[in-house]
């Protein structure tokens, strides 16, 4: 695989996002994540999964530099597949923990909110959040339900409309993140929590997770093309397109310096 690195342990697998320094999400990463989680779901020897990133970046979100070059069909296909990935890992029944090794805005947060626990690297420079409104990407109804599940409807409503990125301390206070740890301890702490879960009877644990998520899952639009059709359509709105192109130009110019 080109965007992921798998580490197999005795009873679980660590899936590390491994696409450059910032793990920007593109079509290939989405496809590899879908395929990997399907295989891990079907593998009886895998009892749980940890999703981790690179040092300082869990994922910087969508790869706008690549996506801005997609044509209309490619954009619709991308959002449909990204929406499908979100639904599939939200419904992943085995223990699933995110080791957030740094920044996790927008698309990075989309991946993280599907997991059962989130442990994040401590540090003032690291942020997490569904800041789609602030970067002119239409958030889906399915994503708003995830935020509300973890932090409650009122706080989720406020933070989504503000396009707010949360510091680690804010994320813990809101219930979005379980704990902050030194960067070098994040993965190890996630493994300890997963090992705790694996001591329980697997069938009972999985049944309990399904019961806890029942109301959340019942609210999901099961048609990924429908859930993100607004995002795909608004991608081509001239004012939004101009802002995205300006952002991409400014970012690529910084990289050249």
Please describe what each predicted stretch is.
Residues 36, 81-93:
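Catalytic-core regions built around general acid/base machinery
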């Amino acid at each position: 695989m080109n965007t992921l690195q798998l580490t197999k342990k005795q009873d679980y697998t660590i899936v590390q996002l491994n696409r450059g320094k910032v793990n920007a999400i593109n079509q290939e990463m989405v496809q590899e994540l879908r395929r990997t989680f399907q295989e891990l779901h079907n593998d009886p020897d895998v009892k749980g999964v940890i999703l981790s990133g690179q040092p300082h970046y869990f994922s910087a979100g969508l790869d706008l530099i690549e996506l801005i070059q997609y044509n209309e069909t490619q954009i619709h296909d991308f959002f449909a597949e990204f929406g499908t990935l979100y639904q599939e890992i939200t419904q992943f029944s085995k223990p699933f923990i995110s080791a957030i090794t740094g920044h996790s805005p927008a698309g990075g947060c989309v991946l993280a909110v599907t997991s059962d626990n989130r442990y994040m690297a401590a540090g003032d420079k690291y942020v997490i959040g569904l800041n789609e409104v602030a970067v002119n990407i239409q958030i889906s109804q399915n994503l708003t339900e995830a935020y509300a599940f973890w932090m409650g409807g009122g706080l989720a409503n406020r933070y989504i409309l503000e396009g707010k990125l949360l510091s680690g301390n804010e994320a813990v206070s809101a219930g979005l993140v379980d704990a902050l740890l030194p960067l070098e301890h994040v993965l190890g702490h996630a493994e300890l929590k997963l090992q705790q879960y694996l001591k329980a009877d697997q069938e009972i644990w999985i049944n309990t997770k399904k019961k806890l998520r029942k109301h959340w899952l019942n609210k999901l639009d099961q048609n990924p093309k429908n859930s993100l059709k607004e995002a795909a359509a608004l991608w081509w709105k001239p004012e939004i397109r101009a802002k995205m192109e300006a952002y991409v130009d400014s970012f690529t110019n910084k990289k050249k310096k």
